[in-house]
Amino acid sequence: MNELKNDRYLRALLRQPVDVTPVWMMRQAGRYLPEYKATRAIAGDFMSLCKNAELACEVTMQPLRRYPLDAAILFSDILTIPDAMGLGLYFETGEGPRFQSPITCRADVEKLPIPDPEQELGYVMNAVRTIRRELAGAVPLIGFSGSPWTLATYMVEGGSSKAFTKLKKMMYAEPQTLHLLLDKLADSVILYLNAQIKAGAQSVMVFDTWGGVLTGRDYAEFSLNYMHKIVDGLIRENDGRRVPVTLFTKGGGQWLEAMAATGCDALGLDWTTDIADARRRVGDKVALQGNMDPSILYAPAARIEEEVSTILAGFGQGEGHVFNLGHGIHQDVPPEHAGAFVKAVHALSKPYHQK
């Protein structure tokens, strides 16, 4: 594989020295970019875009052509695993993802297969290989998966949810059924992420989008427990380099100590957690990624720069910070505002890395 020309992102995740704070954006390949919309129109629909390695590579590369980002992230979806398990993923206009065959009982869980990542999910691995070739060592490629708990929310609810009543009913009335489902999902995620690493992903991230809807005790038992299992099962060195793993629980700022104790390399922060406080609590164990409110990208460039400056000052001097948004970029953000954000991170972070 090509030698990395810019390894700032990987170095920051391992709390090694960098010249400026690295930056990328969750959902950086997405609907805020007109070129993404054009490519998606060619593909026909979202899953066709994910399943076409050349087009998935094209949309992964689009933000890198516009902005000096320090990492690329695989263009895919967190629901590829449940789809490969046979639940029949489809997208309702204006409704988001849905499943034709949601999980309703223990028998449904027992018959779920664990997908072979090079077979049922081979299209994802083809995309990883294609993107790595196209990147030619410019920046590292991030692979990712949803967390078992977050995947389970969609699989049991049948799609997106606000209250998660079906899943919470299972959690409290049939906890063993839910544990069986989460265990199968953790095994599937380990295989899936390890296959991405073998195909060329240089760092991986686990997105626990819905962990924040749980009580502390339930989070430990039904979400973090399974992310810990994943961290333990991942390939941590490939191609002569450490493969850093980042855990991100949206709404999980109160559990950072427990998350850091999993042995992961970095934690993602949403914008509701103060980054200075987070660094005081866990900065000696893990790197931190985040954590600007994505809605600030609606503001003028001067306001974006002010927020970047505040977050950089909050983290302070030294290593172990990857700048990002606290969640995905919104689809109606002007692309030039994203550009102002990336430029501000690099320009304003230099003084924090001078010896």
UniProtKB/Swiss-Prot annotation:
GO terms for cellular component: cytosol. The record marks D77 as: Transition state stabilizer. It comes from the Bacteria. Catalyzes the decarboxylation of four acetate groups of uroporphyrinogen-III to yield coproporphyrinogen-III. Belongs to the uroporphyrinogen decarboxylase family. Homodimer. This is Uroporphyrinogen decarboxylase. It comes from Yersinia enterocolitica serotype O:8 / biotype 1B (strain NCTC 13174 / 8081). The gene is hemE.
